[in-house]
Each structure stands twice: as structure tokens, then as C-alpha cells.
Amino acid sequence: MTRYLFITGGVVSSLGKGISAASLGTILQARGLSVTLIKLDPYINVDPGTMSPFQHGEVYVTDDGAETDLDLGHYERFVRAPVSRRNNFTTGRIYESVIRKERRGDYLGGTVQVIPHVTDEIKRCIQEGADDVDVALVEIGGTVGDIESLPFLEAIRQMGTELGRERCMFMHLTLVPFIGTAGEMKTKPTQHSVKELRSIGIQPDILVCRAAHPIPEEERRKIALFTNVEPRAVIAALDVPNIYQIPEELHQQGLDHIVAEKWGLELPPANLADWHRVVEIMSNPEGEVTVAMVGKYVDLTDAYMSLNEALRHAGIQTRQRVNIRYVDSESLEREGCSALEGADAILVPGGFGQRGIEGKIEAVRFARESRIPYLGICLGMQLAVIEYARHQAGLENAHSTEFVRHPHHPVIGLITEWMTDEGEVEQRDEADDLGGTMRLGGQPCRLAAGTLINQVYGKDRIVERHRHRYEFNNHYRERLAEAGLSFSGWSQDGRLVEVVELPEHPWFIGCQFHPEFTSTPRDGHPLFASFLRAAIAHRDGTAQAFNHEQH
């Protein structure tokens, strides 16, 4: 029997509902419960796949190929349970399903309305996503009072009534601002937010109050009195320097105990030793390294959320503080590569579009010629191929068909546009296994024996997640291999290049997949850990080229 804990937000957005939900989920998991997390997004887009990173931040890709909200990344990093397309639903996806059913005649000619048809679809999606776990934590995006959120709030209100308090609970996240000029905290925004929620028919059981300063006991009692919530269930969520402290912070305030008690559950105590170790290492690093991340969304670091966290996870494994130096790729086109000087490693992440491309290519060249550890992810791998083709293989006008419609040397092309060994363009249609769509989700990859990537993973076959439309053009494989580029990873069928590396370089890897999506703070990821060890060696002046002949 699944129990549901619904998380709503008030006053302002971006208070950290996702991290709060994920933190509570990992505590409940540590107490022996099976847990899943679901995100309901009120926007009308079907998914965030076509949204600008400036609008939405990173698009998080699940193993089954869903393009989802970045909060699902927090879910997987905190809770050792995989998520899928069933863990993220948008208004667009809900309406798409309702309209499809109406066209099929499923509603028997009835008038299709928000209540009951849309709300019933929302409830169906929530229950389908819960999938027989002990507890489903369901986060409703946006802020109470937003018109877009109303159908979702009505749906969870109905679930609370239908399933009862023994199976449903409501947690509301609010802001308790500190007014510096007055020198005091203000509880009115929280009071009014809860009043708005209660007007919809939802009485929260727990309040999590974001605050920059400790909330005095008197203010806590006032909040409890005016919101009809038990004083002990008014939880202070203070600003912390490290989000991985939050599970322990919430546990110390008894949040998991309140949840278990309200549901009448007798659970073993939580073992949070793993989280304590993570926080201890991050608080007491043995050194620090600087990684230059070259991209075009550097003004909004949420666009690289999983990548930022993966580097920090590698810092935990190597006991280093990772300083990420964000470098605007367009600035490299104007000012040269001076912004990369002093970096211990260089990373070019995935991305789309032509803006800043030449700057990224210059960053690849700088890393190659300066023998600085380089990791290119997705687009970063493709640009490493282009740079090498231009400057080492004699293909001066090498480019990708993503940026130039008819380049003289299309070393990178659409998955549907391939050159045969005879140099003829082969057009694949939608009947092909990859079709004309983006390659998404977990895909198997074979690693060549004796290569650096093979040593990094310690295995011959891996599965990593993808999100791309373009791939290396096999017509140029022999030319680039003769020039010294190693092709060390392949798709399962051997048709697509997944990994390239430079044998004569201390550490230079480009991968078509996104390893950041499978990195977690407690387990890390072998590729990022190896990348950081190479950065440490470069910093300390002990870097040596990987000898393929000895492996």
C-alpha cells in the first residue's frame, strides 16, 4: 500500500522543494522504506527538451530516454532509486493525453472539463508513477496561487480526501524573510501562503520554512498558531553551504520521525553515515583543483547542474575542493585563451547551436597543445574531433553539419546523414532503429581493450545516457586514426563512435554520452574521478602520457 506525501511551495519559487523532497526521501530510505519521487510541472510544454537553458536550466535525461526537469537529477543523486518518464509530468503532457482520449471517444461523447477529466488524469499519472513503493513523494512545481497550478492542487486535494490521512500527507515549503533594517523575521508571507493553500482545501501537516537565520521559538509558535500546524512540525530549513548537509539537518529536527508517527509506522533508526562522510570530506578537503568549464550558458550555472555536481562528487572521491571556473566561449573568440591559463583541467560540456563554437574549438586546441587534461562531453567530443581534423589531420575546413549546411569535410553529421566508405551520402529514414529523432537515454557502449577509457571504467562494456542528434562521420575514421586520434568506444552494433582519445596526451577524452547523469555524491563516477586525478597530477607537475602499449 503506497502512501503519498505531497510537497507544495509558497511565497516565491526556487525555494528548494526538489532538494527538500530528495533529502526527506533519502532519510526515509535509510529507515527501511522503498521510496520514489515524482515531479508535476505546471507549464504547458510537453517536456523541457525544447526549452532554453536560460528559461529552465538543465534538461535531465533518464535512463529510459525521457527529457525531464532538473529536480529529477536531485532525486537520483540523493535517493538510490532510478527515475523514468513516469516520474515527471507536465500540464502539456496531461492535456495531450486527455485530448488523445477524447479523440478516441474514451469519454463517450461527454463534455471534457478540467474537473473531472484533467484532475483524474493527474491522479492516474501520480498513482502510475508510484509503482507499489512504500512512499511516493510528489512535488508540485511552481507556487501556490499560480493559475497554472490549480488543476494539480485540486487533484492532490481529491487524493487526500479519497485515500485519507492514513495514506496522504501534505508538506508546504515557504520563505520566512529577514528584514535587515528592522532586524527581525517576518512570518506574514508564510501565514498568507498557507491561507491560500487552505482556501483550496489543503491543510498542510508539515511546514518547512526557508530562512537565512535561525527561527526564534516565539516565531515558530506564531507560525504554528496561525497555520494550524503543530509547533514541532514547523521545520527550519536554514541556508547551508553544501546541499548534502540537508538530510542530516532535517533528520536532526525530526522531520522523518514526524512523518513516521503521523502514518503510524514503526521504523528502524536512520543510518546516515554515508552522508556524514560526504559532508566531512567536503568540509575538510586535502587540496583544491581548478577546472575551466567552457560553455555559452555560464551566466546560469543551473544549465550545467548535473555536471557541476559530478565534479564535486569527484572532489569527494579525491578529497579535493573543486573550483569551477566558468568561461564564456564567446569571450575566447574575442580575447583568446588567457581565461584558461592556470586551470588544472578543461571541460567542454554538451550544448546546441552555433554561438560560441569557435571559442570552444580554441579551448580544445589549448588543452591539446598545452597538455592540460581535457574532457569533452557530447558536443565537447564532436568539437575535439573537428579541432583535431583541422589542425592535425590536414582537413582545414572540417566542421559539423549542425553549424555549416555543406562543409567541405563534414566530420560530424546528423545521425540520419552518413557518408558510406565510398563517400556517398546515405539517408536513413524513420524505419531505422535510430530514426530521425534525437538519440536519448541509456545506450550500451563497447570499450576497446588497452585504452585509457577502458582503464578508467575497468570494464569492456558500459551503459551511459545520451542526448544528441549528431555523430562522428565514419568516412573520416581512417584519416583521423592515421593522424593519431584513437577511437576507443563504440555503440553496441559498432556503427557509432562513442569515445575518442589522444594516446600521446596525459589525459584527453571525448565521449558522446553524458556521464554526469549517473554520478552520485556517495558513489561518484569513474570518469570524473579519473579526470580529477589527472588534474591533480597536472597541478603537481607529475602528469605522464597514458601508455596504450602497456595495457
Swiss-Prot record:
| Pfam families xref list | CTP_synth_N, GATase
Q: Which UniProt keywords apply?
A: ATP-binding, Glutamine amidotransferase, Ligase, Magnesium, Metal-binding, Nucleotide-binding, Pyrimidine biosynthesis
Q: Where is the active site?
A: 378 (nucleophile), 514, 516
Specify which residues bind CTP according to the UniProt entry for this protein. 13, 146-148, 186-191, 222
The protein's annotated pathway: Pyrimidine metabolism; CTP biosynthesis via de novo pathway; CTP from UDP: step 2/2
Cellular component annotations (GO), alphabetically ordered: cytosol
Its activity is regulated as follows: Allosterically activated by GTP, when glutamine is the substrate; GTP has no effect on the reaction when ammonia is the substrate. The allosteric effector GTP functions by stabilizing the protein conformation that binds the tetrahedral intermediate(s) formed during glutamine hydrolysis. Inhibited by the product CTP, via allosteric rather than competitive inhibition.
Which residue ranges does the record annotate as region Amidoligase domain? 1-265
| Positions of ATP binding | 14-19, 71
The record's SUPFAM superfamilies line, in alphabetical order, gives:
Class I glutamine amidotransferase-like, P-loop containing nucleoside triphosphate hydrolases
Q: Where does UTP bind?
A: 13, 186-191, 222
Name the residues that bind L-glutamine: 351, 379-382, 402, 469
What's an example GO BP annotation here?
Answer: 'de novo' CTP biosynthetic process
Catalytic class of the enzyme:
ligase
Role summary: Catalyzes the ATP-dependent amination of UTP to CTP with either L-glutamine or ammonia as the source of nitrogen. Regulates intracellular CTP levels through interactions with the four ribonucleotide triphosphates.
Q: Which family does it belong to?
A: Belongs to the CTP synthase family.
- What additional remark is attached to this entry? CTPSs have evolved a hybrid strategy for distinguishing between UTP and CTP. The overlapping regions of the product feedback inhibitory and substrate sites recognize a common feature in both compounds, the triphosphate moiety. To differentiate isosteric substrate and product pyrimidine rings, an additional pocket far from the expected kinase/ligase catalytic site, specifically recognizes the cytosine and ribose portions of the product inhibitor.
Please identify the protein, giving its name as recorded: CTP synthase
- Report the source organism: Halorhodospira halophila (strain DSM 244 / SL1) (Ectothiorhodospira halophila (strain DSM 244 / SL1))
Q: What is the lineage of its organism?
A: Bacteria, Pseudomonadati, Pseudomonadota, Gammaproteobacteria, Chromatiales
